[in-house]
Design a protein with these regions (language model features):
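Class I (Rossmann-like) S-adenosyl-L-methionine-dependent methyltransferase catalytic domain
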Residues: 1-67, 77-142, 164-169, 183-244
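Conserved S-adenosyl-L-methionine
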Residues: 74
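Short catalytic micro-motifs in class I SAM-dependent methyltransferases
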Residues: 157-158
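A short glycine-rich, Lys/Arg-flanked "PGG" loop and its adjoining helix->strand segment in the class I
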Residues: 168-180
Length: 244
């Protein structure tokens, strides 16, 4: 009997099984990931998954130059990438995530449709919440790209899961890899507990926005635009400080 939901079988299932099974995988199209994979990217609901990815892609394309190089930190199972993939202005896209299943799925179903312009890399980051056996510490992690080489850094619901030492490092790395004319688009929960700049755990971190911007300033970044609440998270566009 065909499945009628997004629920799929055990964690050892083949990648093809980890894909929405009641629709065929049409040629030249990106299929939909299973509810398990979507859930690891923030929501198991297909409608919300697609809506959020579409919104983020529209914002990213607003800042996109021809020949764009994009770094998507915490790319999940291509929630945003699936909408960016057809854009011919993108020279290269690198998606990073500690969830290996998401990376494997994306390399199987997204990368081939981009002639290799889009690649996805697993990062074995330690996370008590998401990857407790990971070997790499987020607070010392270095993005695997050259300095001054990236046009756009995407952090969709990234800082919502980073504790302060990791958040500082990721901002520093953004300042390192971003081109002088580049943009970083980040979202965060901005309602920390009273009197705190940071509160919560890796499941949900809240950061005072002014404090976040002060950390960005120390990393050589400054606010270009506050987009306000986007998909339920405060979203900002950062650029390199003039002269850096």
């Amino acid at each position: 009997m065909p499945k009628t939901t997004f629920e799929h079988v055990d964690e050892q299932a083949d990648l093809a099984v980890r894909t929405y099974s009641t629709w065929p995988i049409w040629k030249y199209t990106i299929p939909y990931p299973s509810t398990v994979l979507m859930g690891s990217s923030g929501t198991p609901d297909l409608g919300i998954f697609l809506a959020v990815g579409s919104v983020w892609a529209q914002v990213i394309t607003h800042f996109m130059p021809n020949g764009a190089t994009i770094l998507d930190v915490g790319c999940g199972c291509s929630k945003t990438a699936r909408f960016l993939a057809p854009d011919p202005r993108i020279k290269s896209y690198l998606g990073l995530d500690p969830m290996r299943d998401c990376i494997d799925w994306s390399n199987r179903y997204v990368s081939p449709l981009t002639d290799g312009r889009f690649i996805f890399e697993h990062v074995d980051l330690h996370s008590d919440e998401y990857n407790p056996n990971g070997m790499i510490r987020a607070e010392t992690y270095r993005f695997p790209v050259a300095s001054d080489s990236v046009c756009i850094v995407i952090g969709a619901s990234l800082f919502t899961h980073l504790l302060e030492p990791a958040a500082r490092q990721y901002l520093n790395e953004t300042g390192r890899v971003l081109k002088s004319e580049g943009h970083a688009v980040f979202s965060l929960h901005a309602q920390p507990a009273n009197g705190l700049n940071f509160s919560g755990d890796e499941g949900r971190v809240d950061i005072d926005l002014d404090y976040f911007l002060s950390l960005a300033d120390k990393a050589g970044l400054e606010l270009q635009e506050d987009l306000g609440s986007m998909c339920g998270q405060e979203t900002v566009v950062l650029v390199k400080k003039t002269g850096l």
